[in-house]
């Protein structure tokens, strides 16, 4: 089987001046993840490696540089799933781990359980060699400013255009007092990262990592780390990672919805396109999806203005910011 790696850096209303940073981040993650596959590593190795790079890049809403909770802290969620045997590891609401995808790998390999939350997840990770950090190490000044701006605008009735785009915001901001307007395009929101891969053995894997939504309530868990919602992998169907507004994705169990359609005969592209249409038609949701079939066929879809994505194969690399 020819190995393939497919990753995303979040589906959202990405401003023009954020494109270059996303392209650099996607390229770096592809390089590291592909090195795992090229050297004979597993799909799980490649997914973990690629997601780790994006967690360490504060361009993305995962790991350091993530959105802040309502009370100004970072809380992280991640899931990793092996399609060969359905072994899965997930963590949520962790505040003192730099790389939650690595903690998810430990849960997958070292625990009879599937999912750990909060201090229990952190305790498990330290018992298996991970180092705890102070939450402030995950916070960047940009996100403090973003949180304050968001909360000011929320109080003034400014609509949240994280996923749908800025057209509504342009109109709405013109009606706001000047001190409440957001003129810096870097203060628009961004989202979750993820990866899917197939290795030389024909095994699939998927992983998703996120800092969640901006100004979320402390303790809120989104779709990213929930099996079948923001992430799923099964050699008998497909591997998927999602990004976007988590609550509608959870209600639809959208990741499993998509892989089931591949199992029923749809191509990954058909299933991804249909899933994102279903997300909007049923619940008005916005987001994106990467999907990989057991034969290495790919699907990429989003209904947000942009979604950063990248593909690595033995033939080369392909990157994009839109795919419709």
Locations of the language-model features?
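Alpha/propeptide regions of enzymes that mature by internal proteolysis
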Residues: 1-324
């Amino acid at each position: 089987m020819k190995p393939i790696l497919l990753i995303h850096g979040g589906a959202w209303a990405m401003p023009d001046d954020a494109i270059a940073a996303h392209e650099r981040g996607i390229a770096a993650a592809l390089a590291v993840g592909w090195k795992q596959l090229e050297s004979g590593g597993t799909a799980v190795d490649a997914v973990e490696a690629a997601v780790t790079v994006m967690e360490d890049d504060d361009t993305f809403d995962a790991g350091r540089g993530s959105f802040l909770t309502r009370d100004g802290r970072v809380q992280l969620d991640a899931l990793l799933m092996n399609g060969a045997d359905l072994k899965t590891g997930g963590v949520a609401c962790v505040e003192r781990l730099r790389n939650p995808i690595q903690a998810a790998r430990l849960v997958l390999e070292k625990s009879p359980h599937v999912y750990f939350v909060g201090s229990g997840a952190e305790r498990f990770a330290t018992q298996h060699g991970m180092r705890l950090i102070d939450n402030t190490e995950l916070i960047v000044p940009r996100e403090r400013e973003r949180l304050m701006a968001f909360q000011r605008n929320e109080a003034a009735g400014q609509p949240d255009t994280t996923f749908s785009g800025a057209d509504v915001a342009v109109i709405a901001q013109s009606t706001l007092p000047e001190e409440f307007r957001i003129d810096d395009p870097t203060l628009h929101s961004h989202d979750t990262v993820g990866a899917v891969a197939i290795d030389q053995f024909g095994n699939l894997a998927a992983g998703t990592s996120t800092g969640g939504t901006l100004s979320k309530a402390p303790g809120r868990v989104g779709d990213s780390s929930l099996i079948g919602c923001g992430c799923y992998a099964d050699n008998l169907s497909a591997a998927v990672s999602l990004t976007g507004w988590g609550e509608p994705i959870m209600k639809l169990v959208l990741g499993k919805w998509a892989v089931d359609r591949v199992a029923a005969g749809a191509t990954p592209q058909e299933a991804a396109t249909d899933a994102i249409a279903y997300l909007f038609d049923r619940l008005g949701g916005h987001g994106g999806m990467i999907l990989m079939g057991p034969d290495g066929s790919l699907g990429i879809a989003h209904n947000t203005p942009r979604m950063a994505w990248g593909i690595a194969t033995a033939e080369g690399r392909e990157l994009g910011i839109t795919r419709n």
